A protein has these predicted regions:
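Membrane-helix interface segments
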Residues: 77-87, 109-113
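"…centered on the first transmembrane helix and the immediately adjacent amphipathic helix/loop
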Residues: 1-61
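Membrane-interfacial alpha-helical segments at the cytosolic side of multi-pass membrane proteins
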Residues: 62-76, 121-137
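Membrane-interface loop-to-helix entry segments
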Residues: 52-66, 113-121
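Membrane-interfacial, low-structure loops and terminal tails that flank and connect transmembrane helices
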Residues: 140-152
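Small-polar-interrupted transmembrane alpha-helices in polytopic inner-membrane proteins
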Residues: 1-2, 84-103
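Interfacial helix-loop-helix junctions of multi-pass membrane proteins
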Residues: 96-120
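Alpha-helical membrane-protein architecture signal
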Residues: 46, 50, 87-90, 114-117
């Protein structure tokens, strides 16, 4: 949560330049890896094209990790079934809304309901992955161990 709030506290120009640098690294890495031999103008063009997408993927990734870090402990402490996505989703989406509200006080930034929706995609995927892998672990690891202990 601290990391997300720290990114949100950055002024718009700082945040934009950081994500632009990441976009530039991606384009230059692709240029080198695939030996495309793009000119500097082409690198700038492709960097501009993916910049918005990189920003939105960063949103999804941040909230994906938040959802995992919230829903996994809830699962371990017995919150399962429909209650896990409801509780973890409420906490994470609520935090996303507060984060967008927080951005309204930062220079060059503003709140966006659309960003909360994009954040919710990462939240949804993170919660589903926790449910899937924890259920899989219970079926494949812990259930056979429980049967083994009963025989002893």
């Amino acid at each position: 949560m601290y990391v997300i709030f720290s990114f949100s506290a950055q002024p718009g120009t700082v945040s934009g330049s950081l994500s632009y640098k990441v976009s530039e690294i991606i384009v230059e890495s692709a240029n080198d890896a695939f030996e495309l031999h793009w000119s500097d103008a082409e690198v700038v063009h492709y960097t501009d094209r993916i910049h918005h997408t990189v920003r939105k993927i960063a949103h999804v990734t941040e909230y994906f990790l938040l959802a995992i870090s919230v829903s996994f402990p809830l699962y371990v402490y017995g919150v399962r079934g429909i209650w896990l996505p409801l509780l973890a989703g409420f906490l994470c989406v609520g935090f996303a809304g507060l984060d967008e509200y927080h951005q309204s006080f930062v220079a060059g930034r503003g709140p966006s309901v659309r960003d909360v929706g994009i954040d919710s995609i990462g939240i949804f995927i993170g919660i589903l992955m926790v449910q899937f892998f924890c259920f899989l672990g219970r079926i494949t690891i812990f259930r056979p161990l429980a049967k083994h202990k009963k025989r002893i």
